Design a protein with these regions (language model features):
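Conserved phosphate-binding catalytic cores of ATP/NTP-utilizing and phosphoryl-transfer enzymes
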Residues: 1-2, 198-230, 389-392, 396-397, ...
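Early-domain small/polar-rich strand-loop-helix modules and first-structured segments
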Residues: 1-119, 197, 248-253, 269-281, ...
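Glycine-rich phosphate-binding loop of actin/hexokinase-like ATP-binding domains
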Residues: 18-20, 28-31, 41-44, 51, ...
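Phosphate-binding loop and its immediate beta->loop->alpha context
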Residues: 32-189, 200, 271-316, 324-362, ...
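Phosphate/ATP-binding catalytic cores across multiple sugar-kinase/actin-like superfamilies
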Residues: 141-160, 208-220, 348-402, 421, ...
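Glycine-rich phosphate-binding loops at beta-strand->alpha-helix junctions
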Residues: 168-183, 321-326, 333, 372-377, ...
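Conserved phosphate-binding/catalytic loops in two-lobed NTP-binding clefts
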Residues: 191-204, 373, 422-449
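Acidic low-complexity intrinsically disordered segments
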Residues: 322-394, 461-610
Length: 610
């Protein structure tokens, strides 16, 4: 029996772990309040220290690049002649100078359907002598560090509670589809996690607010409220809507909408500021070497935080060390002034846009290097307008969903000016004053909330009902005469509706369907974050380009009983289920005998095309 629930924020920029002890008392259980684990990590060569977060950066050192003991951790078992991979603060800071050996944004790669996320593709700019690793392996490495940190803490405090035996609540962006979730689960299983549950990050932030508010939360929201969780971290922007209703005389919380996966966050802002500041230098960005460019980005981040924290200051200084032997004497002094900050961040990323202004799509070249699908339009307010417009059915007689409360999460919102810009924009769109709920620690809320969710699942707190964050469809081939060069159209059959609860299954009402067996077949899957009314059995013959997103297809051969059946279509019915981990399983049951075939969405095979 697990003694602790562990909440893990596997973030794009930082990871964190929160824990809460479960204390049996009589025939019931009580729990301690969630706390943050201080994580030992290398912060400099030969220097180890505890930090509340583990930066999500992995550096793969060259042989002999450091003395063997320079990267030691409290739990390290040194291998003679081989340096361990470096994770955390020093990996981020040192690796920024050697970007070809540094892995960052592994989490964003998990959601990138164009590449094989289980193969070695990172670092993307690695030198030829470096063996690349997969986004799954990189994520597993961060989780392994958290596992080892917890096990060391458990042993040092006599808790007898190894990581592998505890209940793990692992967070993912609400916008992660079933494939990205499966890959995250796969990474956790690689490091020995046995008892896992997946939770969406904005929901975790809301749970953290519930913990912080205690019994007062019921006075902060009321029946009919629609709470917008606006979560902007270092790498992503994530939007979620939570509805407050009543059931049996008690307030009930339901996650009713999630947004698409948007690669846009604080890192984009720091880079934009660096380009703006470099324009004031004699030779611009081209006059800086690689280390100076990185230092400029870091300097702009610090200057941004200083100016936002001190509204009376007009300018924050930035110093770049010189090149080569002129490190000190050749230093460059520059700075970020408030006018540039507001022009780049407030007007560039948070413009006062109209409610009908949607994100620009931008032109794409026919050929492109394979990389992360960053948002073309940097205006977060326009992405928010698109999200609310897609869920207009949640508010009567309106062209967009109208939140009545807002909860901020993510380090970007440490700047009150950015919170105020979002609030003023929403007020203008909706014609009403929208109060902000007081947030917990913006950088640690997700981990704390994940641990609280673990307690709520045990009956030790209120739960948010959510279910799956998309409706899912399987492609149906349409019988049509063969025409050279023209593929037959497909229809989309809804098999799992939006918000279907974990642990549930449903018979999918269908017309007569046939399942080809005994020979290779391809199954096409699609998903939507905003088709709220589709139910199991709904068939779509056409849809707008942004309504359904096609997922990686599944290619497999389903077993036939005899050679005569090979290539034949067996009449079937479909049963769909959502596992406790939030993944999708489809069972095709024969209408003529007792046979059934499972379409298990095997991530590794679906991505390699086998």
């Amino acid at each position: 029996m697990a003694k602790f629930v562990l909440g893990i924020d596997l973030g794009t920029t930082n990871c964190a772990l929160a824990y809460a002890e479960i204390v049996p008392e009589g025939g019931e259980s009580k729990a301690s309040a969630p706390q943050i684990l201080q994580i030992p990590q290398v912060v400099g060569a030969g220097e180890c220290a505890d930090r509340p977060v583990l930066p999500s950066f992995l550096y793969i050192p060259r042989d002999g690049e450091f003395q063997e003991e320079a990267l030691d951790l409290p739990w390290t078992a040194p291998v003679e002649g081989k340096l361990p991979w470096l994770v955390g603060t020093f990996a981020r800071d040192y690796g920024a100078k050697v970007p070809g050996r540094l892995i960052s944004s592994a989490k964003s790669w998990l959601s990138h359907g164009v590449v094989d996320r289980s193969s070695g593709i990172l670092p993307t700019t690695a030198p030829e002598d470096l063996q690349k690793i997969s986004p799954v392996q990189a994520s597993a490495t961060y989780l392994a560090h958290l596992r080892d940190a917890w096990n060391q803490y458990s042993a040092a405090n006599g808790l007898d509670a190894v990581f592998e035996d505890q209940e793990i609540f692992l967070t993912v962006p609400a916008s992660f589809d079933t494939v990205a979730r499966d890959l995250t689960i796969q990474a956790a299983r690689q490091i020995g996690a046995k008892h896992m549950t997946i939770l969406e990050e904005p929901q975790a932030a809301f749970y953290a607010w519930l913990v912080q508010s205690g019994d007062q939360w019921r006075k902060s929201v009321s029946v009919g409220d629609l709470v917008l969780v606006c979560d902007i971290g270092g790498g992503t922007s994530d939007f979620t809507l939570i509805q407050v209703s009543e059931e049996d005389g008690s307030l009930k919380l339901d996650r009713v909408a999630v947004g698409d996966h948007i690669l846009l966050g604080g890192d984009n802002m720091d880079l934009a500021l660096a380009h703006a500041v470099s324009a004031t230098l004699k030779d611009g960005m081209e006059g800086l070497d690689a280390n100076q460019k990185i230092a400029l980005v870091h300097g702009c981040r610090a200057a941004k935080e200083q100016l936002f924290a001190n509204p009376g200051e007009k300018k924050a200084g930035i110093t770049l060390l010189g090149k080569g032997s002129r490190v000190i004497g050749g230093s460059i002094k520059t700075g970020l002034d408030r006018a540039t900050l507001e022009q780049v961040i407030l007007n560039g990323f948070f413009p006062e846009s109209a409610p009908d202004e949607m994100p620009a799509r931008g032109r794409r070249l026919g050929l492109t290097e394979i990389g992360l699908p960053y948002a073309v339009d940097p205006a977060i307010t326009r992405h928010l307008a698109q999200f609310l417009s897609r869920h207009s059915s949640l508010s009567k007689e309106s062209t967009m969903a109208s939140p009545t409360k807002i909860l901020f999460n993510g380090g970007v919102f440490e700047a009150s000016a950015l919170r105020q810009r979002i609030i003023s924009t929403l007020n203008r769109w909706t014609g009403q004053e929208i109060p902000a709920l007081p947030a917990a620690d913006l950088n640690l809320a997700v981990a704390l909330g994940a641990a609280q969710y673990g307690l709520a699942k045990r009956g030790l707190g209120v739960r948010i009902r959510g279910g799956v964050n998309r409706s899912y469809y399987i492609g149906l081939e349409t019988p049509a005469p063969a025409v050279p060069g023209v593929l037959p159209p497909i229809k989309a059959l809804c098999v799992v509706p939006l918000s279907m609860e974990e642990g549930c299954q449903t018979d999918v009402p269908t017309p007569d369907l046939g399942l080809y067996i005994g020979e290779p077949a391809e199954f096409r899957f699609l998903a939507s974050t905003h088709r709220r009314d589709d139910q199991p059995g709904t068939i779509l013959e056409r849809w707008a380009a942004d309504e359904l997103v096609e997922l990686p297809s599944l290619k497999t051969t389903l077993e036939a009983q005899s050679p005569d059946e090979v290539g034949q279509a067996v009449p079937i019915r479909i049963v769909a289920s959502v596992t406790e981990l939030g993944t999708i399983e489809l069972s095709c049951k024969s209408r003529i005998d007792e046979r059934q075939w499972s379409l298990e969405y095997n991530v590794r095979k679906s991505e390699s095309g086998q």
